[in-house]
Amino acid sequence: MLVRGRDQGSGSRLGPIVRRWAPRPSPLQSLAASLDAEPSSAAVPDGFPAGPTVSPRRLARPPGLEEALSALGLQGEREYAGDIFAEVMVCRVLPLRALPRAVTPEMRALVVDWLVQVHEYLGLAGDTLYLAVHLLDSYLSAGRVRLHRLQLLGVACLFVACKMEECVLPEPAFLCLLSADSFSRAELLRAERRILSRLDFRLHHPGPLLCLGLLAALAGSSPQVMLLATYFLELSLLEAEAAGWEPGRRAAAALSLAHRLLDGAGSRLQPELYRCSLGGGSVWGHRSFRDLPSWSFLRSRRMRDNY
């Protein structure tokens, strides 16, 4: 549960996280099971195990890729369209069980939900939020973290993501103010250094939001479908198992679900587009949509209000 402080002048402050975690069913469990991800125990130099990946060599360039990049404002990268597509669609992901034992999925969801509020309050770019959550999951998978420092860790990850994605950075003191002074500016900067050290400065991550834009442009999706798919993609941030999905599969699942809801049960993306973007395999498998109604009961009312 999240609380807000009383209004101070013309603005309001976001209050600290209240430690109340209630178990809830995972609304994306059926989708996660259908992604056919295989666990991997291979180690990588930055200290945490690599998740399942699909080799970029298996990706075929879909027709209309150059036009899709142009629609996203990437005209200068047309020469490298195939390499860009392979890089953003398939990259290393985190293992499905990446959380420390002391951190439950409900605790993580609470921190991410609070970060969504801070992200909206500051008016940050969408890629900043996805990168912040990725850094949070990477840090949690790399080692232990104290429970009373989860909020500090989340804010520090958002601060690092702002340095990667934003032109104007929020002041560290203002981030502390939004947290109701739960930690000091010096503690925030120390947390930033710990993140950089533990992750070995591996901060770049092509998030699923770019993949969604590419797939929507390739499929010719309507703005309504794109908006609904973006909502589903943002809801997946609350799910810890979503960190184990390749960005391309994650975006394709959200886009296909949006098409099915708005265009009818028989509507879905072209199978050849899936094969090009995911290197084979199936997004849906043989799972039904029996968990679909639970999406509307997620406790993140902030996300529903945003869309």
From Swiss-Prot:
GO biological process terms, semicolon-separated: G1/S transition of mitotic cell cycle
Location(s), subcellular: Nucleus
Domain Cyclin N-terminal: from-to ranges: 102-203
UniProt keyword terms in alphabetical order: Nucleus
Domain of life of the organism encoding this protein: Eukaryota
Gene Ontology MF, one: cyclin-dependent protein serine/threonine kinase regulator activity
Pfam families: Cyclin_N (PF00134)
Listed GO CC annotations: cyclin-dependent protein kinase holoenzyme complex; cytoplasm; nucleus
Function: Seems to be involved in the regulation of proliferation and migration.
Protein's recorded name: Cyclin-P
Species for this entry: Homo sapiens (Human)
